């Protein structure tokens, strides 16, 4: 990576500003998935071991008005982080002002402070999300000229807490998580060991147009599953019953199929049900066509076998989007089948592009079998599209 990293700067005795991604799910004030906190630990630990004073910034959920602040405080995160680090985490509970500044000024080497949810600043004119220059400048002034961005999950956004701070410090560098994310995803797409197979699922073609276009140029094969299958089917005149379809994307699907030169591999059967919820019948289709009054909710057994064959010998695999409604045991066979086909390839570099695929791998007990699971759905999608991420572009060149 041509950007400075946290290892390139002297941290001892410095107030080091760090953008982490602690946007974790909370239920009644309890964290239900702490993966993002765990993912940030190597960078935080490195800073404090080097004698730096870590000042952490993160958003949590969406905050547009005062009422939205309820249940969006980072207080539970501060407590969880303290337990994981085995030391106190100072939490003033504010995003600016005398109380925050006083707490920062008395920090000692090796201590950690967490600023309150950066999106609290969105209540008054969306200052965080619109990268208000004064806010970025103010937050930058709280440190000693070093900013570490370790929040891959927001690297595709230009906010005050990443791009804004970067613009106002002497050195803006990448943390270990950001560095790893870029290394795995960008290298997989730009300089893959071949054969390189991409697998794209999820419900909407519209979400993945740019990704499909970019990967058709870069990958040896692109396998399509999930709800967007049926938009591709309908574009070819195949009956889809009541399956999900994006009527306004049929021309796009047709154009992608024409452009693909046989690289785009679609399912050859589906698992269909007579309703999305409260169904009374589930069965495998004979071929591609979905029966009248039914809708496809997963890829079928023939498709699993076809995808297994397409993955044989693959050395690089990037997967983004489940093959079906994996949350329901009746429709998770496709996602499980594809995961198992990926991880059994000898010497494969297997990467999950965040979001629902990451949840599927974790929930279905396959997470530890993959080379890398991205922490950022939207950011990884933009990297897969070949886009430049603002949070990354704002870092200091080596």
Swiss-Prot record:
Reaction equation(s) it catalyzes: (2R)-3-phosphoglycerate + ATP = (2R)-3-phospho-glyceroyl phosphate + ADP
GO BP, sorted A to Z: gluconeogenesis; glycolytic process
Superkingdom per UniProt: Bacteria
EC number: 2.7.2.3
Chain positions recorded as substrate binding sites: 21-23, 36, 59-62, 119, 157
Subcellular location: Cytoplasm
One GO CC term on file: cytosol
This protein's UniProt keywords: ATP-binding, Cytoplasm, Glycolysis, Kinase, Nucleotide-binding, Transferase
Primary enzyme class: transferase
Recorded GO MF terms: ADP binding; ATP binding; phosphoglycerate kinase activity
Record Pfam families: PGK
Pathway annotation from the record: Carbohydrate degradation; glycolysis; pyruvate from D-glyceraldehyde 3-phosphate: step 2/5
InterPro entries: Phosphoglycerate_kinase, Phosphoglycerate_kinase_CS, Phosphoglycerate_kinase_N, Phosphoglycerate_kinase_sf
Record-listed ATP binding positions: 208, 296, 327, 354-357
Subunit structure and binding partners: Monomer.
Family membership noted in the UniProt record: Belongs to the phosphoglycerate kinase family.
Family annotation (HAMAP family): Phosphoglyc_kinase (MF_00145)
Name of the molecule in the record: Phosphoglycerate kinase
Native source organism of the sequence: Streptococcus pneumoniae serotype 19F (strain G54)
Source lineage: Bacteria, Bacillati, Bacillota, Bacilli, Lactobacillales
